[in-house]
Amino acid sequence: VALGSVAALPGGLLTSRCALAQPPVPFNPKTYKIYRNACPRNCYDTCSLKTWVKDGVITFVEGAPESTFTHGTPCVKGLSYPRRVYSPDRIKYPMAQDVRGSGNWRRISWEEAMQRIAAKMLEIKKKDGSMLGLALTKYSGKFGVLNYAVEGMMSSLGYTTRFAGTPCWPAGIDAQNYDMGDMWCNDPEDMVKAKYIIIWGANPAWCSMHSMKYIYQAREQGAKIVVIDPLLSQTAAKADLYLRVRPGSDGALALGMARHLVDKGLVDQDFVNNDAHGYPEFEAYLRNNVTVEWAAEICGLSADVIRQLAEEFTAVNPATVWIGYGMQRHVNGGANVRAIDAFVAMSGNIGVEGGGARYGHLHTWGFNYNAMLQKPPVGAIGIPGAAGTTSEFGAAAGSDAVQYSDRSLNINQTAQGILEANDPPVRMLWVACKNPFAQDFDRSKMKKAFEKLEMVVCADQFFNETVQHADIVLPVTTAFEEWNVDASYWHYWLSINQPAIKPMYEAKCDLEIATMLSRTINKMAPGSCTFPQEFDHKRWLDQEFNDGMAKMFGISSWDDLLDGPKKAILPSSAAWYDRKFKTPSGKYEFKSELAEKNGHTALPEYKPEAESKLPFHLFTPHVQFGIHSQFINLDWMQVFYPEPFVYIHPSSAKKKGISENDRVKVFNNIGEVELRAKVTTNVPEDFLVMYEAWFPKRQYNVQNIVADTPADMGLMKTGAPGAAIHSQFADVVLIGKGESVA
């Protein structure tokens, strides 16, 4: 984009100060209006924001000072939000593509878009006798409660096909439900009370920068910080002790530490005798099957280090473990989480302020989900059975689904689900809050799946790779152009999103799109859709709140959030402070009969990591300057991270004849990716690391080489097994010396 055209955008916001070399303008806060917003991304921190608007234009955002968690400072991604809102690359109008992938887009009206979409839906219903040929794939592009109107829209049309589950954290969710009956973690702000902190498979320096201040404060008060990770991450570099373990060996390490507690008499006998179920059986398993030396051989640490770690953890009180989501994205991820939970429980650190096995929670998500839970039309039919589609938040098919339910396919095997579905086949796909081509797995298979579809509709803000494979794209609002409410799955603050500006161009929020579709399809075929046809944000927000939410946050209505974010009022900052667990026994369950019933071991036993004949373990975490395929396309982020690389250890690079910046091909049986190499000791010798991100000007996609391998757990609570994103393998070859990839 030429400098002149960029400068013509509102306030010249897309032109850097460096480029213009303009003198600074004195800041006068009286010339601004301030609005309340929240970052709705799939991120630990869910920052509470204050948005500064001048002359109808967002000038900058800052953290809400009322939130002791955000503490007035968003991350670099949050600071870049104006670049997202005013990006010239935003989808501005409803568009139709003549041939998918051709790039031949033409602008259409909202009326035409709704009519074409509604006509296709009615065609499917006439052809199949149901709406099962209509599928929804949606996840975490936005986590505002009103964004669940997309699910409600689908339910209001009838019983449809849903992609159930989550690629994010399901194995760990199931594991903690087997152990404690629910997923619930301490307030992250109480980490300041910890005397010993293990960060296990997480990188908060990149993924939860606001949590780092509590970790640092704990260290200032004498706490020791330990990071366990195969990669020397930014967090690991800041730790007092970094332990590099082999990928997927976390369960063995935790069990080895647990065995040492038994050997040294360091088990909290009060907890295991009075608040736990099945501990004698677990101790017997440890004595008969686990030694510290066995664990050391599997995880790659010395036996002495394992013993020292276990003893140091139990020598102080409280001590805590942060269980990262990356750690459970293995074929044995759920088993690994159960083993870590067991170690923390044996040490007596469950239900203790400053302690805990911290994973996540949904305790502040007690909305009514009115936008999501819509009734199907009278006479609608679907899959025989009463169960609705499962998600982290409950049934999405409507509370009156008695005779029929939606058809459920695995979100982590989206392509396979589309290809295999029949009677009826998936004919039409609605994509919202998601970018399957960037975030789902086995991209070559995804292409084949999309070729099978008769219509693809994407609701998005940018022309990403999935949109390129769509027939119709609908422009959606950013968080600064709509009403919403956002809770966190990590901290305990609740924030409102109020429109700071009017919707840009012709963008509309998910809720308004649902009401428009309802009006259109009911005009064409009365009674075809039950979704309310009136769009009134106050009514919708009113219906999401209840007495429980009001009491938890000390508010009378959502309007109170306009004064600033509110924190949940809890008896203690510790999860399970009363040791009243939600398991069948009412106790912490070292032995879970429910896990055994669901095909797992009753005890948290060792399960090995996947193996391969390929020489390198492939890791594809997200980069500091993006969340999955979001943000990295913005101009500011391109300055920090303009090009993707594969990171390889010096000794491995030497064996392959690869030097810094050489052009290489990373490949496996799924596909291949070409890019440049970076040589670093931050990765192990048998590792290749490629950060997942969306680079719009480059042919780069890690999903070319990531298979849709399932994790061991996740089905019970989320409707599908998790994704073993890190149980992947690859090889690499040199294809060019010191060249850049176009």
Model-derived features: positions:
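N-terminal export/assembly segments and adjacent metallocofactor-ligating motifs
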Residues: V1-K264, D275, F282, S302, ...
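N-terminal leader/propeptide and maturation segments of large enzyme subunits in energy/redox metabolism
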Residues: M95-E112, G129-S130, K264-A303, P384-G388, ...
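Conserved short loop/turn motifs at secondary-structure junctions
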Residues: L134-F143, E297-L301, G324-V331, H363-T364, ...
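Extended redox/cofactor-interaction regions of prokaryotic respiratory oxidoreductases
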Residues: Y148-Y216, Q221-V227, G251-L255, V344-Q468, ...
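Glycine/threonine-rich phosphate-binding loop and adjacent beta-strand/alpha-helix elements that clamp
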Residues: P188, F480-P503, A514, S518
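Short acidic (Asp/Glu) and glycine-rich catalytic loops that position anionic groups and cofactors
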Residues: S233-K238, Y285-T291, A315-I323, F393-G394, ...
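Long, contiguous, secondary-structure-rich segments that constitute the structural scaffold
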Residues: D510-L561, S629, L634-Y647, S651-A742
